[in-house]
């Protein structure tokens, strides 16, 4: 019975991969908060991000929430990654084991773009002011082994992005499953067989930047005399979707 369930689950996953890839390919280049695509943890990145089926530590908060159920003792992870052009990325997370309930995880990802010169059409070399930009994601995860060979996990996250005086925010959820099978197991035990992992990340609301930087005086009639140059105007920004990520992996 268990083998039938596992085989059926594998077939469903393969079908979903084909379907979701077809649905999300047209969103490339049209998303915001792309720092959510940067991997967490040296072990995962050294494996080329092929981690969804073997995630079993605090970094599972990012890769596959279901993997957090394999944490046996409360633990923490701190990571600092120097990125491109003086961009710094930091992750801090912890996993807390609650007997007979599951594992709870908390994680914070912060990306700092540093400071830059403020420029405009009149002062293209800089106005003398400086501005900064940063992205933050706070994640709450719950994971549990439903049975000995099947784990499920979900995350709720709050995403915030700030550029000088303008900011945007969104909410999202992550879902993940991890299945231990006895396929290709030389001992017949599930733990020695093939693992199947799947996760969907960043399914949530859209982000739209707003702030005092979007409010500027506009001259509605620059070729006519009169006090038209102090009319309050607002630059309306568009809404952008979060980068929806679908991962599936197999490990032996």
Where are these regions (language model features)?
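Short, basic and Ser/Thr-rich N-terminal targeting/leader segments
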Residues: 56, 72, 87-88, 136
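N-terminal periplasmic accessory domains that precede
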Residues: 59-70
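Bacterial Sec-dependent N-terminal signal peptides
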Residues: 1-25
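Short polar/acidic secondary-structure junctions
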Residues: 52, 68, 83-84, 183
